[in-house]
Amino acid sequence: DVVNSQAGDTLPVSSFMPYVDGTMPAGTAAYEKRGVAVFVPQWQPDNCIQCNTCAFVCPHAAIRPFLLNEEEAAAAPAGLKLAQGKANLKDYKFALSVSVADCTGCGNCVDVCPAKEKALVMVSALDAQAEQENFDFLNTKVGYKETIVNKAQSVKNSQFAQPLFEFSGACAGCGETPYIKNITQLFGDRMMIANATGCSSIYGASFPASPYCTNSEGHGPAWANSLFEDFCEFGLGMKLGSDRIRQTIAEIMTEGLDCDKASDEIKALFKQWLENKNNPAVTREVADKLVPLMENTDCPHCKKLLTYKKFLAARSQWIIGGDGASYDIGYGGLDHVLASGENVNI
């Protein structure tokens, strides 16, 4: 990468034209592979109780649990350690793997491991290089089986979901990033984030490295940064703007129910969306079915709706700021936004 090679001043203006609106490519932090850790955790499967607490506290999403079926386990690299899944996951093989090149060596995972004999021990990063191949295989070939468990039920289940915030440039042992990472595992495919200037804006959007990424379906958090003094109002504005767009969608769909050029299938999906427009699961399902149909019809209402297709799935608005923004210069806005009763998360 030209910028990471400190040769960004050689780039022509034309290189930046796709990003004149302030956007930047998602998931680019995954390509940095800084390899800054001297020591990294190594999994001891015989001691592991498979609680996933280590992954839960990892500031950089560098240690992750994976579930493998029989075919995936058979295709795994020879050096990959596997254990039999426990309880309702006994039909799967369980693996805990570390991205050695992305780990910062903070040791948080080892500290929180509740096993009587620690299931993680710190070893030289030089001696653990082979683990990177295992992690890459699990991350790209096996993936995340978050649909076979209720990821919102427990810490353990949540960690089987793909983090949509990974490998940021936050300090080793950061206490902020685990919260963001875990929120993206629960809501990331439909999140909008209003961020206050501070650490979260540095590790969250230092061009060209973005730790916010997308899942296999291309869905991920939308992130924007504001100042200390108005971060809550900024987030409330994002929520109100999204609500107005979705109100427009509802109006177009209501009119579309009487459109002769809309098929019965499209009208049924319109009706389902209108009845469940604030239900995340239903609206995502409807959107996945509806968009391809609307792209292949002459219905004028469908053509209008395609402009707003990214807003079909119900969104989850988050507002993230530090102590200075929340308790000092931005408290007035925080107080008013909380009092508004709007459905935002701070």
Which role does the model predict for each range below?
Residues 106:
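Active-site substrate-binding loop specific to GH73 endo-beta-N-acetylglucosaminidase modules
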Residues 1-102, 110-318, 324-325:
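Ferredoxin-type iron-sulfur electron-transfer modules and their immediate structural context
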Residues 329-346:
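A short alpha/beta connector and helix-capping loop motif
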